[in-house]
Regions:
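Conserved SAM-binding loop of SAM-dependent methyltransferases across substrates and taxa
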Residues: 81-94
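Short, conserved SAM-binding/catalytic segment
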Residues: 111-122
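Conserved small/polar residues in nucleotide/adenosyl-binding loops
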Residues: 126-128
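Class I SAM-dependent transferase core
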Residues: 2-69, 115-117
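Conserved SAM-binding motif I beta-strand of class I
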Residues: 96-101
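Short alpha-helix immediately C-terminal to the canonical SAM-binding loop
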Residues: 106-108
Length: 128
């Protein structure tokens, strides 16, 4: 769904060298986001380039702005569709995430997304 070559180049320009597996995970994320968004409104941004830049690349800027030690535990309060924490997790697999949101429909989406990305063992979901 996303243009992985374009996204890889944009990420590299910001200092993020993405592996083939990471690019696959970003593509899976984008596909599932658009698919699920047809049933439940998660985002207004659903075009491939918009997802690459406004969701994924912008989310990765967290890793440039905040120094997170190896294995850091991070909580994303009001996570919505998982931005910026899930893209950061794709790049930094060592992070332990807790995603907290007030809408259960988002938690359901994130639960399925974490399974699809193989992150269910290092990601916790909380509905408040």
């Amino acid at each position: 769904m996303i243009d992985t070559a374009r996204f890889s180049a944009a990420a590299a320009a910001e200092g993020f060298e993405l592996t083939a597996r990471q690019l696959e995970q970003f593509d899976q994320y984008a596909q599932f986001l658009v698919e699920y968004n047809e049933k439940v409104n998660l985002t207004a941004i659903t075009d491939p380039e918009g997802i690459e830049v406004k969701h994924f690349l912008d989310s990765l800027m967290l890793l440039k702005a905040v120094e997170l030690p190896e294995g850091a535990s991070v909580i994303d309060v009001g996570t919505g569709a998982g931005f910026p924490s899930v893209p950061a997790k794709i790049v930094r697999d060592d992070l332990r995430l807790t995603l907290l949101d007030g809408l259960n429909k988002r938690i359901v989406f994130l639960g399925e997304l974490s399974r699809r990305l193989g992150q269910e063992n290092t990601l916790s979901l909380i509905h408040i």
